[in-house]
Amino acid sequence: SAKAVKIESITVDGQNLIIKTTEPNGSLLSSLTEPAFVIMDTADLKDVASKPVLTGPYKITAFKKGETIELAAFADYWGGKLGLDSVTVKDIEDNNKRAMALQSKDVDVIQKVDSANRSLFKDGFNIQDIAGVRVLMLKVNHTEVSPLHDKAVRSAIAHIINYDSMAKIIGNGSTPGAAPFPPSANLGYDAIANKAMTDVAKADQILTQAGYAKNANGMYAKDGKELAVTIAIWGKDTSLYEEIQQELKKAGIAVTLKKLQSPDEVDTLGTDGFDLVERNVVTMSTNDPYWFLSLFYKTGAKANVGGYSNPQVDALIDQLSVTFDQNERSNIAKQAQQILVDDVADIYLLYPSATVVSTTKVKNV
């Protein structure tokens, strides 16, 4: 929205588009590349629901919500002649049905191939695993109603989880998590110190120093109360979280999995409804770190559902919002990441890759 990107007015002067903001906005240009923003001809909106007039190499000729988008090459596209005269995009949400469509050659290219269906395309197909900027993480409840309010508890849990195992369960080129932004974001991943690594002995040491001890049931307890956490999850595939549940139970922490109906419930869950909650987020949807940091880690931000708050992080996010030099922006993001890792602000499980499978006749995807 205009409010989100701090736009006061937009005017046109010949070939110049003049955007006036309400305050300095270092991420303005990046924000305008967000896929949710489009340039649309608003002169005639009678067919906007089925044939909107937009920009780009292809024009929409037909649209059926939840089914298909028919595209035709735009002859006057500034980038020159296109490789295809037309493209049909089919909306197939089910993983198995999508895989079957490619097997039967009803479609030529599919994305979002899960590890269970990957083996179907070993022969006679092209498979590409593309490192993305998405992070699958567990948002932490930092409020006093949760045992994870204690940094020792969240740090111990972060050391118990087997990140290599997490990446293998998801498969398709996924890599183990350890920081807010993946290495592919080019925001100093390798330079971040104290990233969580699997070390159950270290977890035991941390909990022991915090006053926890194992009881007769082999579970950690303090002041007569066993350490137990609730993980709220919403995805269809629960195998990843069942693995975490078993890992924590084996180490001495009881886990209850709380199934949500959709990711939309996360924002309205309330801090009394979880200790950890599943989030799957594109960290650099605009190729800039501001959106992710401000939305998930600024004190009081909507997606900061766990109530994380650190004045240093808030100050860095504020600084990021008014900084225009790209190198400076990257350095600020690196500083914020280091604090988030040191605080165990959240637990970063893995970085999924985008998997694209096509028939052999398709080139240059």
State where each predicted segment sits.
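A bilobed periplasmic-binding-protein/Venus flytrap-type ligand-binding module shared by bacterial periplasmic
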Residues: A72-Y77, G132-A156, I160, I169, ...
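Append "and occasionally in soluble cytosolic enzymes with long acidic Gly/Pro-rich linkers
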Residues: H149-Q246
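Surface-exposed binding/hinge segments that line
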Residues: S1-D41
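Ligand/substrate-recognition segments at binding pockets and active sites
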Residues: A213-M284, A354
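Gly/Pro-rich hinge or "lid" segments in bacterial periplasmic/extracellular proteins
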Residues: P24-L82, S86, V200, Q205
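A structural "hinge/loop" feature
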Residues: G26-V38, K139, V357-V365
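Ligand-site clamp/hinge motif
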Residues: K46, F74-S119, A254
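Detector for C-terminal structural segments
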Residues: I160-Y189, K236-E243, D267-V365
